[in-house]
Amino acid sequence: MRPFDLIRFKQSGRPITMLTAWDCLSAALVEAAGADVVLVGDSLGMVALGHATTLPVTLDQMLHHTLAVARGFTASHDQQPLLVCDLPFLSYQCGPDLAVAAAGKLLKESSAAAVKLEGADPEIVAVVDRLVRMGIPVMGHLGLTPQAVHRLGYRRQALDPVSQDRLIEQALTLEKTGCFALVLEHVPSELAARARHELGIPVIGIGAGDDCDGQVRVTADLLGLTPHQPPFSPPQLNGRQLCIEALRGWIQEHQSSSPTTAPPQAEPDC
């Protein structure tokens, strides 16, 4: 899978599916399930590393997990999902030079084929422009942007006409600058539908309604492995409880099969 395949899918009306992975086991699962795109998201900071937000995740951690995900794929290279890696907080916001170094490290040292970054302020647009000019495919991300949690929170975004027009303008700017796809998170469904019809690149939604070119979900949320799931990402099964019950069953079976009599006590030396 390559970035241009997603644009072809949009043109043909084929829905795009994108799931996250954070290690070789989760990668093997989402590949076997048939996901078009596998995102090594900085959400791994919360799913796998126990942080409260995505902000503490480092570039080295993203590289470490991307390498693990790549090792989890079993199909031939041309049959593998498109592997996209998040650029973590402050690896690209400080300017194009640092962004090229960070994105280049991820693509050179792992099997990632593209990077994803958040926002569309002028500074970010300049970063996208430089990355694209350097031959690095970029996926954009607007709406609820988790790296801006301290400024925007986890609230639904773009609720009024002015902010909606601004988001569409930002999306068009990202497309013009060279992004091959755009994630829209936690925005009104009518806004996502508008973006889908105004943009030539795929609009991939999460909490943005069904009228998108594709959908992305955090795999751990879909499997019900996390204690709490966002309202826009209901689990497909109660994986957490199933795992607990399986582990508890093994523990109880092991305990019940243990000898009921205590081993003889050793005689004291004196």
UniProtKB/Swiss-Prot annotation:
This is 3-methyl-2-oxobutanoate hydroxymethyltransferase. The active site is at E185. 3-methyl-2-oxobutanoate binds at D42, S43, D86, K116. Homodecamer; pentamer of dimers. The keyword Cytoplasm applies. Its cofactor is Mg(2+). Signal peptide: none annotated. GO terms for cellular component: cytoplasm. It catalyses: 3-methyl-2-oxobutanoate + (6R)-5,10-methylene-5,6,7,8-tetrahydrofolate + H2O = 2-dehydropantoate + (6S)-5,6,7,8-tetrahydrofolate. GO terms for molecular function: 3-methyl-2-oxobutanoate hydroxymethyltransferase activity; magnesium ion binding. Mg(2+) binds at D42, D86, E118. The keyword Ribosomal protein does not apply. Binds 1 Mg(2+) ion per subunit. Keywords: Cytoplasm, Magnesium, Metal-binding, Pantothenate biosynthesis, Transferase. Belongs to the PanB family. Catalyzes the reversible reaction in which hydroxymethyl group from 5,10-methylenetetrahydrofolate is transferred onto alpha-ketoisovalerate to form ketopantoate. Pathway: Cofactor biosynthesis; (R)-pantothenate biosynthesis; (R)-pantoate from 3-methyl-2-oxobutanoate: step 1/2.
